[in-house]
Every structure is written in C-alpha cells, then in structure tokens.
Amino acid sequence: MQNTTEKSSRSAEGLYKFFIYFVLVLLAVTIIVPVAWVFMASIKQNAEFYGNPWALPAGFYWQNSVNAWNGAKMGEYMLNSVIVTALALALLLVVALPAAYCLSRFHFKGRKILNTLFMAGLFINVNYIVVPIFLMLRDSDVWLKGHFGSGFLLNNLVVLAVVYAATALPFTIYLLSGYFATLPHDFEEAAYIDGASYFSTMTRIIFPMAKPSIITIILFNFLSFWNEYIISMTLMSSTKAPRTLPVGLLNLMQAQQSAAQYGTMYAGLVLVMLPTLILYICVQRQLTQGMTVGGLKG
C-alpha cells in the first residue's frame, strides 16, 4: 500500500514538473521567435517581404542598418537616448541611494511621513500626470521668457532626464530602503568606533554590501528610461527638438511603412533592442543574485 502511494505521489510530481517545464518552454518560444524574426527581417531585402515571411534571408543585407543609422537619423536618436538615460540614472542614484539609506537606517522626526509620501508615489501612474507636468513646465517657461527673454524647460534633454529621475524616485527608494533595512548594523557600529563618518560608512560599507540590489535597480530603471515614449514625446514636442530612440523609431516606422521599406524599419527596431539585450547579458548573473538575495533577506 505504501509503495502504491509513493508511486502515485512520484507520478503526480513528475506530471507537475512536466507541466511547469512545458509552460516555461512555451513562454520562451513566444519571446524568442518574435525577436529572432525581427533580427532576420532586419537583414532582408525589401523584395523578400513579399514572399514567405518565415523564410530565411537570402543573404545579409546590411544596407538596411546603414539606412536606418544615417538616413533615418537613428544614430542621432541613439546618442540622445544614451545622454538622457545616463544622466537620469546618475541623478536618480545620487538622490535615491542616500535617501533610502537615511530612511532605512536612521530614526528621526518625519521619517514615517516621508516613507508614506514615497509609498503613495508608487500608486501614481506616470502616464496620468504627463499633461500636468507639461503644463507646469510650459507655464514656467512662459514666465522665464517674460522675465529673462528665453526659456529652457521644454525641448531640453537635461530637463527630460530630470523628469525621468523624479518619476522613478518612489519605486527606487522603496526597493532600496527595503533592502538596506535587512543589512546588519554591526558593520556600521564598528566603522563608527573606528572614526568613520556617516558618508564614509554609507559609501564604503553599505553600498558595496547592497551591490546586487543596486545593479537590479539600475537595470530596471535603464529599461524604463530607454524605452519611455509618452513623456519624451510630450516634453519634446517641437519639430526641431532632439528625439529619443522610441520617438524616432515611431517616426521611422511610419515613414518606412508608407514607403514600404520594411527592412530599414526592422533594422531601426534592432538598433533599439540591442543595447538592452547586451546590458542584460552583461549583468544577468548580478541581476539574478540581487533578486534572489533580496527575496531571501525579505
């Protein structure tokens, strides 16, 4: 009787594992196949799109990438995205890391109020406040023009980076402070005894210990900033304003669809995807470690 029960439990466990693996493989296929198709489409000649869409490319037609990079200004758009993303990440880390450290490691008056305010920010969808942000910047720009002759708050990559960093603060501080709170206080106390300052303790002890979570935050926010479209399109509305990659890609797709230049369109899409894929491959191990350690400590 016991052997029968063990066999049935093993059979159920094996069936469960098979189901899990089947679902995972199915999800992987649904992700890999479209990405692979886009990469293949980016090196096809235009005539190949009118045949079998699943056929392998007849050759490597790199002119699509050249046309997208030079003719469609994707190189210029990529540089703008690199500047905005790097600046937004730098501003975000400069503000969020000390803020999360103070909120998680020190007890002071108003700490709970600040935590509540940052928590409330998690429930605000950024897409819903794009118009108020635009109106606020526009009115401030009008005031600057009236008093100083010119404004700089709209169609400005630096201002766009500041807005990106500000909208990402609640999530970043919430996640980092939760991780910082799980770190032991023994190292800090030993550092204080040795005469280390609060800043030195934060930068030399706490931040290295929290490296996995910091890398996770950087990757998540990089993906968010790199692929962001609504805010960029709204705040960079002038025809002469610099464009980021998502906005430039949409313009490219509309232009190439009307001209039936599908190869150039997919080549532009590949240029947008490549940096995120390369970054993920480079930090995959640290990202997994950060998520695992955070889950275990939580």
Named regions from a protein language model:
Residues 2-298:
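A hydrophobic, multi-pass inner-membrane permease signature
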